[in-house]
């Protein structure tokens, strides 16, 4: 059976690894969770043992749901007497997206109404509603007009361990705490005799979770006690009892062997008292030493190796003071220089303030707050005085300040639209003339890469000044984003030798996977001038994907096929991708395969797009045409978009099905559309403003775009 295990964003790949370790043969990371496949007993084992999951959702039905009446009818059609008894209590959680049903509470209420009405149809009493502790919790996911109904096997969020009492300010959810511990490699270090330290421990969440992890205590034991987590009629009570019995045996052995190698301190006595009380309830107080101390007075533990895990203050209620982060970094370098640190910082600027060199950085979310998790191993870099912060030159500091300003400006937009690849800087300071694009890896090590494109400097600028400014810009970018040199690609936008538009740069042949508009994509940041993903077209691709459901999609001059892939993921009936380059078509094929989009409905055509259009007789509902400005391939006629626009657009419009739309775009800055001639065969309107994202507003001429429809 296929089922879904949800988690906080940023934990997906850790969760997939955890589920594999729990015995699942198929566990594939996706947005905010993992698509799993296994038996009910395995799903119940996840409820008991997962430290990272939020919910385990066991499907009971799925159906097309174009509107609220279809939702009600689909739910009412189910035999609910097979899932819940009249005397039981019920709760419904709903997650909706789309333009037909937009309110989750309304959807949940309609589901409750349908369940109650179906029970009455069966001559049964209606079950009561209990949103806090229901006997059965039903979950709805409504996406792209399709409703999926599941039983929440855990009965609620699995981050609750059952030990938390008095919570101090800004408590960390336990499953996020587990992620910090796993990124710190705490299980490995504990097995090797290492210690665990949190110098700003608050109410003790990280240390208590670390102690339970070290003692092999199942997260679900205290949460559920002796009762099953759900009274759903399909729940396997015998399997749960066996899982519970095994967990109790492992808990007894683990707690008996747990040694006092865990250290926590905080300047707030109230926090220390809350931490001690929580540790007592969790049964691990004997393993944790809590002390009241300022971070500046941090003492060195007796263990030679170990992990530091810390969640310094950064939310709106607790002022995020860079000086506090600097004090934390200095204290760690002095007390535990050879340990490994996993620090959850509020943002890149605060991570930079620690003065620590991060080997890896991950994007995570503490509730709605986007955070930067930095991994430092070792904490202190040999040969560097920990008391001396890395200083930037005056020019580099200007660039760094502008980058931080831009990141702050983009933060809410990026969170709202799930943007992980974007332009952070575009010659904002004229003397530092370059574009800096950020690519956040999806999966793998979840590294952050920078793609820096330096614009050609005027001949009057001395070469020494060009080199100095380039180095200052790179230094600022690396500091702000906390990336090592090998994750920075530096290129010049000058014309290649021999007039070639695309010159070969490094020979790394290194692809990373990123995500845009719900699609996974391969990019190559080092080998070519362009990366395989034109970031400026992001809004236009999203627009087309939103229209693609059940449609026939044609992508002319398709490049690496990103628009085709996103249309396929969005539910296009078919995609046709045309390009003269076999390299790009293979790239497109790989991108489709990466998203599980194969089959004859996704056609790849190696051909000159102009010639192919003249011979094709197919009809398409959505066409994307993004031609190059110039092309002089040996296998096709020379192409000039200004000269060939009428021929190209006439042929493309002729392939539109009734009601179809053609999106035409190009980045030739001196391009002039022949509007009067086009008006003879198409309705045409410019939509450029709708296709420029916030990160390209500084360079609104990056491209232009039009929407064309057949006359009549």
Swiss-Prot record:
Domain THUMP, residue spans: 42-153
Catalyzed reaction equations: guanosine(2445) in 23S rRNA + S-adenosyl-L-methionine = N(2)-methylguanosine(2445) in 23S rRNA + S-adenosyl-L-homocysteine + H(+); guanosine(2069) in 23S rRNA + S-adenosyl-L-methionine = N(2)-methylguanosine(2069) in 23S rRNA + S-adenosyl-L-homocysteine + H(+)
MF (Gene Ontology): 23S rRNA (guanine(2445)-N(2))-methyltransferase activity; RNA binding; rRNA (guanine-N7-)-methyltransferase activity
Main location: cytoplasm
GO cellular component, one term: cytoplasm
Keywords: Cytoplasm, Methyltransferase, RNA-binding, rRNA processing, S-adenosyl-L-methionine, Transferase
Class of enzymatic activity (EC top level): transferase
Pfam families given in the database record: Methyltrans_SAM (PF10672), RlmL_1st (PF22020), THUMP (PF02926), UPF0020 (PF01170)
InterPro entries: 23SrRNA_methyltr_KL, DNA_methylase_N6_adenine_CS, RlmKL-like_Mtase, RlmKL-like_Mtase_CS, RlmL_1st, SAM-dep_methyl-trfase, SAM-dependent_MTases_sf, THUMP_dom
EC number per UniProt: 2.1.1.173, 2.1.1.264
Subcellular location as annotated: Cytoplasm
PANTHER family from the UniProt entry: RIBOSOMAL RNA LARGE SUBUNIT METHYLTRANSFERASE K/L (PTHR47313), RIBOSOMAL RNA LARGE SUBUNIT METHYLTRANSFERASE K_L (PTHR47313:SF1)
UniProt family annotation: Belongs to the methyltransferase superfamily. RlmKL family.
Role summary: Specifically methylates the guanine in position 2445 (m2G2445) and the guanine in position 2069 (m7G2069) of 23S rRNA.
Name of the protein described by the UniProt record: Ribosomal RNA large subunit methyltransferase K/L
Organism of derivation: Stenotrophomonas maltophilia (strain R551-3)
């Amino acid at each position: 059976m296929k089922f879904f295990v949800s988690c906080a964003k940023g934990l997906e790949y850790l969760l997939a690894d955890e589920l594999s370790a729990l015995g699942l043969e198929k566990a594939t990371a996706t947005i905010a969770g993992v698509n799993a496949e296994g038996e009910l007993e395995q799903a119940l084992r996840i409820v008991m043992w997962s430290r990272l999951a939020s919910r385990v959702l066991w499907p009971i039905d799925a159906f097309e749901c174009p509107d609220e009446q279809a939702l009600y009818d689909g739910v009412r059609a189910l035999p609910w007497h097979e899932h819940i008894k009249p005397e039981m209590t019920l709760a419904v959680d709903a997650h909706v997206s789309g333009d037909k049903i937009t309110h989750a509470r309304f959807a949940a209420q309609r589901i409750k109404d349908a369940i109650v009405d179906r029970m009455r149809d069966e001559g049964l009493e209606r079950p009561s509603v209990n949103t806090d502790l229901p006997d059965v919790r039903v979950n709805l996911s409504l996406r792209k007009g399709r409703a999926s109904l599941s039983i929440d096997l855990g009965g609620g969020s699995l981050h609750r361990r059952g030990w938390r009492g008095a919570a101090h300010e800004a408590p960390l959810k336990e499953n996020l705490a587990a992620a910090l511990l796993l990124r710190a490699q705490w299980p490995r270090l504990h097995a090797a005799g290492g210690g665990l330290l949190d110098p700003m421990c608050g109410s003790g969440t990280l240390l208590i979770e670390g102690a339970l992890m070290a003692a092999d205590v199942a997260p679900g034991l205290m949460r559920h006690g002796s009762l099953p987590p759900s009274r759903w009629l399909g729940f396997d009570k015998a399997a749960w009892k066996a899982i519970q019995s095994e967990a109790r045996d492992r808990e007894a052995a683990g707690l008996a062997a747990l040694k006092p190698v865990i250290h926590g301190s905080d300047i707030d006595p109230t926090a220390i008292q809350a931490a001690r009380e929580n540790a007592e309830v969790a049964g691990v107080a004997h393993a944790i030493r809590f002390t009241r101390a300022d971070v500046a007075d941090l003492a060195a533990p007796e263990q030679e190796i170990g992990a530091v895990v810390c969640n310094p203050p950064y939310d709106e209620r607790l002022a995020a003071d860079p000086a506090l982060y600097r004090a934390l970094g200095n204290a760690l370098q002095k007390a535990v220089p050879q340990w490994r640190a996993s620090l959850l910082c509020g943002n890149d600027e605060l991570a930079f303030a620690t003065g620590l060199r991060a080997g890896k950085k991950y994007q995570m979310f503490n509730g709605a707050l986007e955070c930067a998790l930095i991994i430092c191993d070792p904490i202190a870099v040999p040969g560097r005085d920990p008391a001396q912060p890395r200083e930037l030159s005056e020019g580099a500091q200007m660039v760094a300040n502008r980058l931080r300003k831009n990141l702050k400006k983009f933060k809410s937009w990026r969170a709202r639209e799930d943007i992980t690849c974007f332009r952070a800087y575009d010659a904002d300071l004229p003397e530092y003339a370059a574009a800096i694009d950020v690519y956040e890896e999806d999966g793998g090590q979840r590294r952050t890469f920078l793609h820096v494109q330096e614009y050609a400097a005027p001949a009057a600028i001395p070469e020494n000044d060009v080199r100095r400014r380039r180095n200052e810009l790179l230094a600022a970018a690396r500091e702000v984003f906390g990336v090592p040199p090998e994750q920075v690609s530096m290129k010049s936008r000058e014309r290649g030798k021999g007039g070639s538009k695309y010159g070969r740069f490094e020979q790394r042949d290194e692809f990373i996977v990123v995500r845009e508009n719900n699609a996974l994509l391969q990019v190559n940041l080092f080998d070519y001038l362009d990366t395989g993903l034109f970031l400026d077209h992001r809004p236009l691709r999203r627009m087309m994907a939103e229209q693609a459901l059940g449609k026939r999609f044609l992508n002319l001059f398709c490049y690496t096929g990103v628009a085709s892939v996103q249309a396929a993921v969005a539910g296009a009936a078919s995609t046709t991708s045309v390009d003269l380059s076999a390299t790009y078509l293979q790239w497109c094929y790989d991108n489709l395969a990466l998203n599980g989009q194969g089959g004859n409905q996704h056609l790849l055509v190696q051909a000159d797009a102009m010639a192919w259009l003249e011979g094709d007789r197919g009809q398409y509902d959505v066409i994307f045409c993004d031609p190059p400005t110039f092309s002089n391939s040996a296998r096709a006629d020379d192409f000039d978009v200004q000269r060939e626009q009428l021929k190209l657009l006439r042929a493309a419009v002729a392939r539109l099905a009734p009601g179809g739309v053609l999106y035409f775009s190009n980045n030739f800055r001196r391009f002039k559309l022949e509007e009067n001639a086009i008006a003879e065969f198409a309705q045409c309107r410019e939509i450029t403003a709708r296709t420029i994202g916030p990160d390209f507003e500084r360079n609104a001429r990056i491209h232009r775009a039009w929407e064309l429809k057949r006359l009549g």
